[in-house]
Design a protein with these regions (language model features):
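Bacterial N-terminal signal peptides that target proteins for export
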Residues: 1-6
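N-terminal signal peptide c-region/cleavage motif recognized by signal peptidases
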Residues: 13-14
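Eukaryotic scaffold repeat domains enriched in small/polar residues
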Residues: 19-356
Length: 356
């Protein structure tokens, strides 16, 4: 019996010790980090990014001149390094429909993905449109209608997106686009906007996706994809060769409450979106010592990981107070211990100062 118990302990100990070894990271949330002008309000904040000057860009679905899921809901807002409002970029832009993410490239160009219009827009640092990808559907288009997609979906096409989600870059200036809710693939275009290739389709195998929802690159040009519906992160080289995948498997703490609705049951979690640890957003810190941050909707945490997928720490929980989260949709990590998080349900951006 004694030997049997010893063997049992050897089997369960690594898992138990691994769970105990994941620390909770202490952190603060800066009150009111982004200061809007009077009579301007955030709606759902779906994107956040930071440029080389420390200016913060927030993508909000707060424009009330149109329906919640139609033209003009998107607003792209810029704040200086102290959080003071600078300007709105792209007001009344043709592509605006249902903004998904905003990202700043190494040259401080501003990129926005719009899920509703199926478009990616590149602005220069002054806020002028310099490149567009995809095409917005119009009422005159054959076999389709505005803001709708046929079922079953049409075959994926080069240069056309269907509910596109995010962008990232490598050192050569190539852009990687996660596309998205329908096409379930990653696209690659060069610095001049020429379509190079795409990889992936809908499925569960390595190299397949179920809602590639966020994308990031490391200093070596590897591409990290938040495969949200399959509750995993997949890693590829810059040509789309599958390298590895990993999942975040940290138990939900007792007493955890969802940000909205009931606690997800097995059927709800089976869809992937609300599976604990399922990645909604990714960001990778600058070199030389890069780490990966990922967020989930349930139980509403942020995870700090090494680039090979080891969970180094966790922080936060669902809720409405500072240091709590309501569906983090995007993150920016200008340094290892400073995070900006964009929340859908709480209509805000939080600035987090980590104290590991």
């Amino acid at each position: 019996m004694r030997h049997w118990l010893a063997g049992l302990m050897l089997l369960i100990a690594p898992s138990a010790f691994a769970q105990q070894a994941v620390p909770n990271i202490a952190f603060d949330s800066v009150p009111n980090p982004l200061k809007l002008p009077p009579n301007m309000y955030f709606g759902e904040v779906s994107g956040v990014s930071v440029n080389s000057k420390g200016h913060v860009f927030a993508l909000s679905r707060g424009n009330t001149s149109g329906p919640a899921y139609a033209a003009a809901a998107t607003q792209l807002l810029e704040f200086d390094a102290k959080g003071a409002f600078v300007r709105e970029i792209g007001k009344n832009l043709y592509a605006w429909s249902f903004g998904h993410t905003v990202k700043i490239d190494p040259q401080d160009n501003i990129w926005v993905t719009d899920k509703g219009s199926d478009m990616v827009i590149k602005f220069d640092p002054e806020g002028r449109v310099v490149m567009v990808f995809g095409r917005k559907q119009e009422a005159s288009d054959e076999d389709t209608a505005p803001l709708k997609h046929p079922k079953p979906p049409l075959p994926a096409e080069d240069g056309r997106f269907r509910q596109v989600t995010d962008v990232a870059w490598d050192k050569a200036g190539n852009t990687f686009i996660s596309d998205g809710y329908i096409n379930s693939r990653v696209a690659k275009v060069d610095k001049d906007g020429n379509w190079l290739k795409s990889w992936g389709d809908r499925g569960k195998e390595p190299g397949q996706f179920n809602t590639p929802h966020s994308i990031a690159t490391d200093a070596n040009g590897n591409v990290y994809v938040a495969d949200r519906g399959n509750h995993r992160i997949q890693v590829f080289d810059g040509d789309g060769k599958f390298l590895r995948q990993f999942t975040i498997d940290i138990p939900v703490p007792p007493g955890a409450k969802p940000a909205i609705g009931k606690i997800p049951d097995e059927a709800m979690m089976a869809g992937g979106t609300f599976f604990p640890g399922s990645p909604w957003s990714l960001c990778i810190t600058p070199p030389p010592n890069q780490v990966l941050y990922s967020s989930d909707a349930w139980p509403g945490r942020i995870y700090k990981l090494s680039l090979d997928g080891k969970v180094l720490g966790i922080l936060g929980q669902s809720g409405k107070q500072l240091k709590q989260f309501g569906w983090i949709h995007a993150m920016a990590c200008p340094s290892e211990n400073v995070l900006y998080v964009a929340e859908l349900l709480n209509w805000r951006v939080q600035k987090l100062l980590l104290k590991p």
